[in-house]
Structures are given as structure tokens and as C-alpha cells.
Amino acid sequence: MATHKELIKNGLWDNNPALVQLLGLCPLLAVSATVTNALGLGIATTLVLIGSNLIVSLVRQWIPQEVRIPVFVMIIASLVTCVQLLMNAYAYGLYLSLGIFIPLIVTNCIIIGRAEAFASKNDPLPAALDGLWMGLGMTSVLVLLGAIREILGNGTLFDGADLLLGDWATTLRIELFHVDSHFLLAMLPPGAFLGVGFLIAIKNIIDKKLADRQPKQEKTEIERARVS
């Protein structure tokens, strides 16, 4: 059973769903044009991940092996419907902005993958924590990519935060620089694809530097036995 520290490390860095597993790229590329959209989808995905992992872990002993995937999908779809209704009620502007990508959480490979690979084989608490940290790992990449694209494309940060947090959040909007015309590439999916590649490259460089700092284990020289 994985420890809490291992779950945090795997979810946020070593096995990050976006930068290592490369799962959920469709919403990652399409929705991360602004920090607000990225954060909204990240929170929704995290809630579904926690709920699906917890429920799958609780009922795993009663699910026949042959039909486990359809059952997992039904559980995920039910949770996505609940999240969609909540967002429709309390964050309607963001609900309209995210559009089809909210119900598409059902088909997100991250969620079904964690249900199959981890939740179905572990106790409820570790399963819920795995969902939490995998969701936060995905959300962190979404928000970081959204920040890069929003700054390059609009020169702003937290634009439209009131759609997620309420009217008071209009004060969070920061205009870093004024642009007469938008940097269109940053706002379109190809720009998001380049941004993801940039983040993956940075992560790989950091991993390589960390690996180089580790003391190399010297291999013990094995002497051949002489047989006479």
C-alpha cells in the first residue's frame, strides 16, 4: 500500500497525469485559455476523481471482474452529472464557458485509469487520497498552462474570475500589459499544445538535474573464479 507521501509525490510530480501519463489532453488543450476556465475544470475533475476512487474502492468486492469497466463508467457519469448540476446552479457563467467539456469528464482517461489501476485494488482512504493528489496534479498543470496562455494572449491574469468565485472576484483581475491585438496562437489549441511541450521539457530538465545530484552507486567488481 502506497504511503501518503508517495501518493503526493506521484500525483504532483513523478506520475503527474498531464506531464507524465499524458492523459486528459483534450480538455487540457481546449479549456486552458484562461486561468478561470482551467481552475474551474480542474476543480470539477478533482471532485469526480475523489468521489469515483472512493466509491469504486468501497464496492470493489461486489463488482464482477467481467463488467467492472461499465460499472466504473456509470459511477463516474453519475458523479459528473452531480458536478454539472452544481456548476449550473452556482457558477452558471463558467458552466456556459466550459460547455461540452464538463460532461466529457466522463470519458477522461485519468479518472477511469485511476479507478482501474488504483482504487479497485486499495482501501477507501488511500483511494480517495490518490484521487485528490492526481486531481491536484492535473489542476496545477491546467492552471499553469492557463496562466501562460492568458498572459501571452491577453496580457491579463484571472480575467473572468467572477464566473467561478462570484462578483467580489472581479478585483482579482490583473492587467500585466496592454495589447492592441491578441496573440492568437497562444489562445488556440496549437498554442496550448506547444505550451504543454514546454512544461514537459522543463520537468524533464529538472528530473535530469535531480538525478545527476544523486550519488552514483559503484558496482562491485566481480572476480571470476578460476577453475583448475
Curated annotation (Swiss-Prot):
<feature type="transmembrane region" description="Helical">
    <location>
        <begin position="39"/>
        <end position="59"/>
    </location>
</feature>
<keyword id="KW-0249">Electron transport</keyword>
<dbReference type="Pfam" id="PF02508">
    <property type="entry name" value="Rnf-Nqr"/>
</dbReference>
<keyword id="KW-0813">Transport</keyword>
<keyword id="KW-1278">Translocase</keyword>
<keyword id="KW-0812">Transmembrane</keyword>
<feature type="transmembrane region" description="Helical">
    <location>
        <begin position="182"/>
        <end position="202"/>
    </location>
</feature>
<keyword id="KW-1133">Transmembrane helix</keyword>
<dbReference type="InterPro" id="IPR010968">
    <property type="entry name" value="RnfE"/>
</dbReference>
<dbReference type="GO" id="GO:0022900">
    <property type="term" value="P:electron transport chain"/>
</dbReference>
<protein>
    <recommendedName>
        <fullName>Ion-translocating oxidoreductase complex subunit E</fullName>
        <ecNumber>7.-.-.-</ecNumber>
    </recommendedName>
</protein>
<keyword id="KW-0472">Membrane</keyword>
<keyword id="KW-0997">Cell inner membrane</keyword>
<comment type="subunit">
    <text>The complex is composed of six subunits: RnfA, RnfB, RnfC, RnfD, RnfE and RnfG.</text>
</comment>
<feature type="transmembrane region" description="Helical">
    <location>
        <begin position="93"/>
        <end position="113"/>
    </location>
</feature>
<feature type="transmembrane region" description="Helical">
    <location>
        <begin position="18"/>
        <end position="38"/>
    </location>
</feature>
<dbReference type="InterPro" id="IPR003667">
    <property type="entry name" value="NqrDE/RnfAE"/>
</dbReference>
<feature type="transmembrane region" description="Helical">
    <location>
        <begin position="128"/>
        <end position="148"/>
    </location>
</feature>
<comment type="similarity">
    <text>Belongs to the NqrDE/RnfAE family.</text>
</comment>
<keyword id="KW-1003">Cell membrane</keyword>
<dbReference type="GO" id="GO:0005886">
    <property type="term" value="C:plasma membrane"/>
</dbReference>
<feature type="transmembrane region" description="Helical">
    <location>
        <begin position="69"/>
        <end position="89"/>
    </location>
</feature>
<comment type="function">
    <text>Part of a membrane-bound complex that couples electron transfer with translocation of ions across the membrane.</text>
</comment>
